[in-house]
Amino acid sequence: MLILGIDPGTAIVGYGLVEARAGQTRALVYDCIRTPAGEDPCRRLATIYAGIRELIERLQPETMAVEELFFNKNSKTALAVGQARGVILLAAAHTGLPVAEYTPLEVKQAVAGFGRAPKEQVQRMVQALLGLEEKPRPDDVADALAVAVCHASFAPWRQREKEVAGR
């Protein structure tokens, strides 16, 4: 299964394409979409949307895994990230790409074995699990790969739940 992991943001959207086959996962492509600071917020969202659409069309993932919004103390930041998530989900919907969403706690649990693992531990585990020579940078890229690895772990269970519920 080809999974496009996404870490939403307004300045940087991390992404990583992970292949999960026969219990093995490997990173195929990872990078980020950047939007210029100070640019009109609507232009930034348009840049994110266009970038995600281009990735979906070029990489042909089978599914997208997106980190859910974690509300912090800065509501302005949370709102902006929520808008970025919206255009990311819209790009997936326009291309018919299925989307799975995971909380930061679920991602950390799947990757590091502990839902409250520090960011550094999650990054080291992403590096180890995907056999990367270096930790992916910036952090947003490592987070996107972590979301994809999380989905690779959860996808079989989610499919089984659907099958059981459909009976």
From Swiss-Prot:
Gene3D superfamilies xref list: Ribonuclease H-like superfamily/Ribonuclease H
UniProt KW keywords: Cytoplasm, DNA damage, DNA recombination, DNA repair, DNA-binding, Endonuclease, Hydrolase, Magnesium, Metal-binding, Nuclease
Cofactor: Mg(2+)
Chief localization: cytoplasm
Native source species: Moorella thermoacetica (strain ATCC 39073 / JCM 9320)
Catalytic function, reaction form: Endonucleolytic cleavage at a junction such as a reciprocal single-stranded crossover between two homologous DNA duplexes (Holliday junction)
Binding residue positions for Mg(2+) 2: E67
Pfam hit, one: RuvC
Name of protein: Crossover junction endodeoxyribonuclease RuvC
